Amino acid sequence: MTLTMNEAIQLILDFRYVPVGYWKDIPIEDPLVCQFIKEGYATLDAEHQEKYVLSDKGADFLHTYIERISTTFIEFLKKKQLSCHDTDAIHWFSETYSLDNETSESLYDYISFNLKVYGYKRQKFHQTEYGWGCQFEKIDE
């Protein structure tokens, strides 16, 4: 399965961001999600058989895209001395991946929380008229 970055972002947010997955009893109209499930990237949850969640295969598959997005975002942060406002980061996601504001905000929330996997963490330190100021810092692995 080959995805555009925007398709990958959609699936990342569908399967990695709240609410995670798709309910079995609600018809899935999105052909991309149907294909993703059909190819075994998502399966019914072992505990809750009524919901499709990522399989190990799907997690590995999406990780490639998550890593690419995270690495690119870290480079953006390094150019800003690891400090920026939420609104700047959301705008960056919007511009970089041609996303609407809501999708950009969700992706920023997910990626910035997940940066600990790549050795960084986010700390909100003050609120201004431009949003929360955030400091990202390198953490020991």
Cite the ranges covered by each PLM segment.
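C-terminal engagement modules used by replication, chromatin/transcription, nuclear envelope/ESCRT
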Residues: 127-141
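Amphipathic alpha-helical segments in structured regions that serve as interaction surfaces
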Residues: 72-76, 86-97, 104-115
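A short, conserved structural fragment
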Residues: 37-47, 115-126
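Short amphipathic alpha-helical interface segments
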Residues: 1-31, 68-92
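Short amphipathic alpha-helical interaction segments
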Residues: 23-39, 101-110
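Accessory beta->alpha helical hairpin/"wing" motif in late/C-terminal subdomains of nucleic-acid enzymes
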Residues: 47-64, 128
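Short intrinsically disordered terminal tails
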Residues: 1-3, 95, 138-141
